[in-house]
Amino acid sequence: MLATEQSRPAECNGAHAHEKTEEVKKPLYSRPVVLTTYPSQSRIDPFPMNWGAATAEERGPITVARSIETLPHRNAVGAHGGSYSVYNALAVAGGFLPPDHRPNFELTEPTFDFPELDSWHDPKKIVAMDPYGHLTPSVFKKYLDEGYDVRPTIAITRAHLQVTEIQRSVENGSLPIDGKIVLNEKGDIAVTKVAVEPVWYLPGVAERFGVDEVTLRRALFEQMGGAYPELITRPDIKVFLPPIGGLTAYIFGPPEYLSDTSKSLAVRVHDECNGSDVFQSDICTCRPYLTFGIEEAAKEAQNGGAGLVVYFRKEGRALGEVVKYLVYNKRKRTGDSAENYFKRTEELAGVRDMRFQALMPDILHWFGIKKIDRMLSMSNMKHDAIVGQGIKILNRITIPDDLIPEDSQVEIDAKIQSGYFSEKKVTEDDLSCVHGRHW
């Protein structure tokens, strides 16, 4: 005879009762899946977005969230957080983060109040970041109070940098301790840091690249696996938050000096190279040039001017680290000669460089920079992009020869021959004589 509830031991009955009364877990999203939206739908009423307007209020907030409250009013495609938006999704799926979480922005205000500049209102000068991204909790407070999910895309703070090469320069006396910029014998450097997430105004981005907006939208949609269908179905939405890394700007000296043309300014624009910047691989000059730029920026601030280092997340010339390492293998297995330096990348990636510096000057415009006294870069692409945006470069500073690792001579000579600024002349014939080590 089968056991019944009455014939079972009490502890079994209790356990069984507990199982029966356990609440069924509610689904994260109760409404039907909305794959995309269209401008003609009845509930669609996006908040006005007037890119380049004279004030933040006239421009309007950037609303990208897909919450029930915000979805009809979205005026941007994409998601906050850039590439980290994926981890946000994992946190929600795993039950660690409520999908309707709203941040508490109390005490997160910028540590420096950058004055509003004419460039913030110029739709030709700023197309790849939200000029009001640091002011969201204040200038768009009424939207937050009404329950809409609007978030900052810029954060500003203060910090101390500790860099081994800087400490050595302090120890050998080449970088003095002044107590304001270089703080102590350990080589701590005081900086203002600005983190920026990308916010693209699609008509402006298309213009920078010399293509029409429809072509840009289709390419973004197709090459990202169809992840953002509203790039196609919502031509009325002109703003896109792409799933890529942003930038961090490190300011040495008073931030207000960046826009003061009476002050001397040293600038290093640097694209991420994890292998060298962090782990000090010697196959390229990235970390040596970065630390040289930091030291020169600090010296400029000590001399009464200002320094700026802008660090972009564009790993491996924006080809990615996997592609970069595959290229390294090709190079090392074929003799690693300077004459084939770019060829090996093109064989694998189809292009030698995808950093495309057209969007890079936006952060310089945001700071109000009109001239750079000392450009700590040899890149012709960066130089041309900056000058092409109307910012003067008075002097270009090359990396000192004694900072170039032996195995990176292949890279630097190939780049000089292809157009990098240098007093050194490198011909095509010279490249065939320059080789790196096997491994």
Swiss-Prot record:
Q: Which SUPFAM superfamilies match?
A: RibA-like
What is the protein's major site of localization? cytoplasm
Where in the sequence is the active site? D353, R355
Q: Where do the segments described as Disordered lie? A: 1-24
Instruction: Report if keyword ATP-binding is assigned.
Output: no
Q: Where does Zn(2+) bind?
A: C273, C284, C286
Question: What is the annotated localization of this protein?
Answer: Cytoplasm; Nucleus
Under Enzyme Commission nomenclature, its number is 3.5.4.-
Under Gene Ontology molecular function, one entry of this record is: metal ion binding
List keywords of the entry alphabetically: Cytoplasm, GTP-binding, Hydrolase, Metal-binding, Nucleotide-binding, Nucleus, Zinc
Provide the Gene Ontology terms for cellular component. cytosol; nucleus
In terms of Pfam families, this protein maps to: GTP_CH_N, GTP_cyclohydro2
Query: Mind telling me which InterPro entries this protein's record contains?
Result: GTP_CH_N, GTP_cyclohydro_II, RibA, RibA-like_sf
**What are the GO BP annotations of this UniProt entry?**
riboflavin biosynthetic process
Q: Which family does it belong to?
A: Belongs to the GTP cyclohydrolase II family.
Report the protein name in the record.
Uracil-regulated protein 1
Supply the source organism for this entry: Schizosaccharomyces pombe (strain 972 / ATCC 24843) (Fission yeast)
